[in-house]
Amino acid sequence: MTLVAITYTRGSLHILNQLLLPHQTTYDPLHSARDAWHAIHEMRVRGAPAIAIVAALSLAVELHTLATSNQLSAEPKDVGQLILEKLEFLVSSRPTAVNLAEAAGRLGRIVNGRAQVQGVGGNEVAEAYIEAAERMLDDDVRDNRAIGESGAKWVLEHAITKGSISGTGQAKVAVLTHCNTGSLATAGYGTALGVIRSLHATGSLERAYCTETRPYNQGSRLTAFELVHDNIPATLITDSMAAALLARQSAGPAQSVGVSAIIVGADRVAANGDTANKIGTYGLAVLAKYHGVKFLVAAPRTTIDMNTKTGADIVIEERPEKEVTRIRGPRDGEEGNGLGAMETITVAADGIGVWNPAFDVTPAALVDGIITEVGVVEKDGSGVFHLERIF
């Protein structure tokens, strides 16, 4: 059964509440752009592609409701202005992820173009927006599968390590990933986790390793949930164990293949290849370089921001202190009776200062390739990415 995080039919949108995973599976309805803003900001939905799609579809639902109840203006410019204001509001929910801003800009241009057509009414402008937002859902799944296939092929061609041939003679790889980049972070299949899924589908994956990803634990809560759901051989490690994992030739249950590649997603890729992603990504890239392990970024072209020249220009979101000092989960059941009620506990000394950036920036010099839906972009002989060539 395929894991579905976003369910949509015209006029109806539900998201899988990721704050409750892996212990509860609850779908929250979103009726408006305001509902989506709160869901994104509270991280009930997260992942750069997913938040862009949820934001776009939430406004589609709101517009459909207004149109069917005759509450939309007949004036196309008024409806266009309403849509642009709602899109601007949605972008403010998580400023680091470029997909959201890119989608808002693209949808805004479609709306402006439709509103300027002579004889068009307000409902038709809304309809143009709704159709464009709905296409985003289908396009993302298609793009993710292409990313998975391209990435898997590149890894097998470039990242096979000594000892990576199984007893059957088939090349197999072990891959480490960070945060969550699967069906929960996209419309489906995933980016970095999509590569892992593609490797597994062809029998080429020995084992996937996922980091816990403190402080929000997207790895232990979400990626581990997806890997178990898909019956992919996987091992969870804490963030601080990554260096030790790369340093040894074998690790984990039934493991005989050293890690060949670290594959991560991205929230924004600058024009030069500098990559903003979940905090801890930069450290993994440094470790990969030291240990001679390939480091790959998997992201659709919508994540590449050609208007941002380098990573120094990327705004890094900072999250509340309590995300570091507290942790939430169900009470462990007594005497094998399962899980108890959800509780929040404190894990830090009272009064300690906290710095909690949600993302860091990995320099392009540490990235071996950027996996997109149109192929893997590598650096030229002088170590420079030419990302403009894929647009």
Curated annotation (Swiss-Prot):
Site label Transition state stabilizer, positions: C179
Recorded GO MF terms: S-methyl-5-thioribose-1-phosphate isomerase activity
GO BP term, pick one: L-methionine salvage from methylthioadenosine
Source domain of life: Eukaryota
EC number in record: 5.3.1.23
InterPro entries: IF-2B-related, IF-M1Pi, IF_2B-like_C, Initiation_fac_2B_a/b/d, M1Pi_N, NagB/RpiA_transferase-like
HAMAP family: Salvage_MtnA (MF_01678)
Name the UniProt record assigns to this protein: Methylthioribose-1-phosphate isomerase
Source organism of this protein record: Ajellomyces capsulatus (strain NAm1 / WU24) (Darling's disease fungus)
